[in-house]
Amino acid sequence: MSSLPALDLFLSKYQQAYVDQLGEQPRYYAQEQESDCVVGEMDSDGAVFWQGVVRDNPGQFENVESALELTLCPEINTFYGRHFSAPLFFDSKWGSGELIQVWNQTDFEYLQQNIIGHLMMKKKLKQEPTWFIGVLDDEDKMLTVNNADGSVWVEIPGELQSTKLAESLDEFISLLTPRVMPPVKPIEESMPELDHPGIWQRMKLMWNNLRGK
């Protein structure tokens, strides 16, 4: 598995930042989804304290590669398959945003389906393959990795990558600062398929808007 030391370091700094500023570990509205990340009991508001953990059995993307007949940049296995974690909020010189992570194995499988959907959309649009790692808070800007060379870019759904942020995923993560903030309650959606915690709702709304164009 490819190594992303910056991700391990960021997770460590993330946990410590919450302890230093709030005197507690970060909290997350997991909507009663179990995870090895959970520390203690759910609070009265429905949030859980959590801590990122290294998976006993790392997640892999061979099934996605086989389904699409495409070789993925190896960093995808480390970024999404090494840990279980809640989404990670950050500040950067490009603004604030979130990095996607997976909460449990079911979440990982859900992620793979979305990666496949994203790559199929890129193929349909006759664009080079990319895969997403998060979003910026500025409107509908995704953070994506160029599958050919591993560089990190800003991408708006349906368009080509527009602004290059770093030569590699490890370099990009090393430029981020953990953002300490209260847990964000998921927005209630009327469609059952959108009922998923946190960042996924934003990602799905972006793609739904694209399909509606």
Swiss-Prot record:
The keyword Transport does not apply. This is Protein Syd. Pfam families: Syd. GO terms for cellular component: cytoplasmic side of plasma membrane. HAMAP family: Syd. InterPro entries: Syd, Syd_sf. The gene is syd. It comes from Shewanella pealeana (strain ATCC 700345 / ANG-SQ1). It is found in: Cell inner membrane. Interacts with the SecY protein in vivo. May bind preferentially to an uncomplexed state of SecY, thus functioning either as a chelating agent for excess SecY in the cell or as a regulatory factor that negatively controls the translocase function.
